Amino acid sequence: MRAGRGATPARELFRDAAFPAADSSLFCDLSTPLAQFREDITWRRPQEICATPRLFPDDPREGQVKQGLLGDCWFLCACAALQKSRHLLDQVIPPGQPSWADQEYRGSFTCRIWQFGRWVEVTTDDRLPCLAGRLCFSRCQREDVFWLPLLEKVYAKVHGSYEHLWAGQVADALVDLTGGLAERWNLKGVAGSGGQQDRPGRWEHRTCRQLLHLKDQCLISCCVLSPRAGARELGEFHAFIVSDLRELQGQAGQCILLLRIQNPWGRRCWQGLWREGGEGWSQVDAAVASELLSQLQEGEFWVEEEEFLREFDELTVGYPVTEAGHLQSLYTERLLCHTRALPGAWVKGQSAGGCRNNSGFPSNPKFWLRVSEPSEVYIAVLQRSRLHAADWAGRARALVGDSHTSWSPASIPGKHYQAVGLHLWKVEKRRVNLPRVLSMPPVAGTACHAYDREVHLRCELSPGYYLAVPSTFLKDAPGEFLLRVFSTGRVSLSAIRAVAKNTTPGAALPAGEWGTVQLRGSWRVGQTAGGSRNFASYPTNPCFPFSVPEGPGPRCVRITLHQHCRPSDTEFHPIGFHIFQVPEGGRSQDAPPLLLQEPLLSCVPHRYAQEVSRLCLLPAGTYKVVPSTYLPDTEGAFTVTIATRIDRPSIHSQEMLGQFLQEVSIMAVMKT
């Protein structure tokens, strides 16, 4: 892989050290066909590719997506959603950025990607992978338009490399680009999944009619999972864009529904009845046929409803998003103006109870949903992607972007998820007999546990309290999730806090003599409220050093984090802490900063409790404890108490006083 040659600009242009023009940004394991081009790919800036580069075209059709050598049709189909909404486009690509003709141009590009409940700003340079001087991955219909390849590069940076984008779900990319919801509709049904269905049923026809009302409001994508014999030109596991639908009156008076399909490959691969010059066009007026054929861009073709339902396997539909940021129901077109979200986790041995087949199901995370008025409600469980190995963490020293919402190379999402489901019970009041409630049939639930990043329920709910229980299929399967609620009416969402053994407030210390240190601190927005280790701002959290003295062996240490709020206050923040051991002699030059390394011990997942603590054995040495809230920019005050057992022989009085004395020595109180 070589760096591309071009004219050296008069001013130095930005080079992204966190995502360099190197093999590490292209490949993850050289497992895809992309590896064969390793020695031929060069990196060039847009002004080195063409004379007058532009971010956006004057004619939207010139910005149409085209796929290159990378197998990321799923992401490119989702990008087409941005072309339907100026609001979404401005949300993802902030307007006003200096471009190549501007004096302020410095060779950088910033966009926003929605990640696990937050819009994250990601900045990279504009050096793009090329073959023989041309873009080798995504490009627009006009090759002097660069919004798409630049956005693709940012998305590759979020995932760790371009190769990580090889294969994925359109629905996942749609959520990342809109912050909303997406649905996948199976066009074949259960019977058709085995290839036994030749003619579409009434449900599938109703689905296509429904798309007529959605085509201008949201992205519609379709895919082929396993092409029929004789239709191999569509490809396998390939995603397409449904760019238009038209309902026509045939010459014989019949109703004909046509769908215009765009192939991201940029070539017309359809050989059906409604191909250009196909016999299907004889069924409609010649002027109508001419008009529809003239609308086709490169890579587009028309297909009739019956053919579409026979040849395609699945539809993905993104929920419309208004300029105010509200989702719109696909089924009723009502606005889902009320939203709530809370994080949660399945922890092995504690809260990973498995599905309803397991006796441990009641130990799963549980949430109260209060519905104040009759509402159409969507409840979604979004899994946090598992992280790749920490070999990317060394790049964290070169973070780019907004400090409190920036992307962290230490948090590169993976593509492996647990099989998850969600069930909902209605209860009369919040104080319930939990085993009895969970033994009853739920009022709503997912049909099965699915290996999808996000699953959701759609419900028409009457006012009252509901118990929501997200679960993995297997017991003790760990994972983190975000529970999201979208509703037409007012709702509230709260977590049911389980009392854990190591989080009991005011737990007594074991017998013996203890030295106690109390450290007071606070989390402040934009300063010391860095959030959990999932966020790049984590190192800004308060950090307290402490030491364990030499002794005959490890010392027993209890660390307690107490947040300052009233016990009756329902607005507890989810809190936790990590303990890092400071290396003897200091950090080596090649090692990442201490807080970007793996902690020695942790008190996680973050819990909605006033106090969390952990009792541990620590060898002599220097340590740092970092208390944090789960989300960044969550303000609050706290006290960290570090109690260290003092190992020395007990002194007994020769005079029996009737009761031995236990000494507790208060060593220091530090305010920060």
UniProtKB/Swiss-Prot annotation:
Enzyme class name: hydrolase
GO cellular component, one term: plasma membrane
Family: Belongs to the peptidase C2 family.
Role: Calcium-regulated non-lysosomal thiol-protease which catalyzes limited proteolysis of substrates involved in cytoskeletal remodeling and signal transduction. May play a role in insulin-stimulated glucose uptake.
Designated name of the protein: Calpain-10
GO molecular function: calcium-dependent cysteine-type endopeptidase activity; cytoskeletal protein binding; SNARE binding
Classification via InterPro entries: C2_III, Calpain_cysteine_protease, Calpain_domain_III, Calpain_III, Calpain_III_sf, Papain-like_cys_pep_sf, Pept_cys_AS, Peptidase_C2_calpain_cat
Lineage of the species this protein comes from: Eukaryota, Metazoa, Chordata, Craniata, Vertebrata
Domain annotation Calpain catalytic: ranges: 13-321
Positions of the catalytic residues: C73, H238, N263
Region spans: Domain III 1: 322-494
Pfam hit, one: Peptidase_C2
GO BP: any one term: positive regulation of insulin secretion
